[in-house]
Design a protein with these regions (language model features):
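Hydrophobic alpha-helical transmembrane bundles of multi-pass membrane proteins
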Residues: 1-196
Length: 196
């Protein structure tokens, strides 16, 4: 943690990360909400919009409560815990110890990084929504989203971006090809092929 505090704030990087965070949020609401809303029958538009807003609310809560910690904490790796290859740990739950004064090696506050990564956690299940359109009740979608984020997204984010085993093997995922697109694509394919 002390190495994080020795880095100086890069205002240019920080400003760009804040702008990128806002742009990714706009891809979810209104972007995906309106896109999928335009693809369904008129009677289901409100349902799609509501499901997208639900994703933003619930996944944000999961991310703050324990998602960021599971994906990007190094607690388990530092202690030699065998779970380190799957999840990061619990030391950053509820963003404990993360503030504007904790500067990452890239020169941005860790809180800015956490919010940027939260936007990817939001948009990934929103991409899957298209496979569910007009096929599932809201309660079923709620259950799926919560479980999928916990079981599929958070471990994958740790494996590839948070120091997990894929990152240690040399996997590089610059634009979310693995964590976001493959992860959401496989889930959407399974749902699309699933007979209700």
């Amino acid at each position: 943690m002390s190495s994080l505090l020795l880095t100086t704030l890069d205002t240019g990087n920080t400003a760009w990360m804040i702008m990128a965070t806002i742009l990714v949020l706009l891809m979810s609401i209104p972007g995906i909400a309106l896109f999928y809303g335009g693809l369904v029958r008129q009677k289901n538009i409100l349902s799609i919009l509501m499901q997208t807003v639900f994703i933003v609310a619930v996944v944000s809560l999961i991310w703050v409560a324990f998602g960021y910690s599971w994906a990007f904490s190094t607690e388990y790796a530092d202690s030699g815990n065998p779970l380190a290859c799957v999840i990061g740990g619990f030391d950053k739950c509820f963003l404990h110890g993360i503030g504007l004064d904790a500067i990452m090696p890239t020169g941005i506050p860790e809180l800015t990084f956490a919010m940027f990564q939260c936007m990817f956690a939001l948009i990934t299940p929103a991409l899957i929504l298209g496979a569910f359109a007009e096929r599932v009740k809201f309660s079923g979608y709620v259950l799926f989203t919560i479980l999928w984020v916990i079981i599929a997204y958070l471990p994958m984010a740790h494996w590839v971006w948070g120091g997990g085993f894929l990152q240690e093997m040399g996997a590089i995922d610059f634009a979310g090809g693995t964590v976001v697109h493959i992860n959401a694509g496989v889930a959407a394919l399974v749902i699309a092929l699933w007979e209700v």
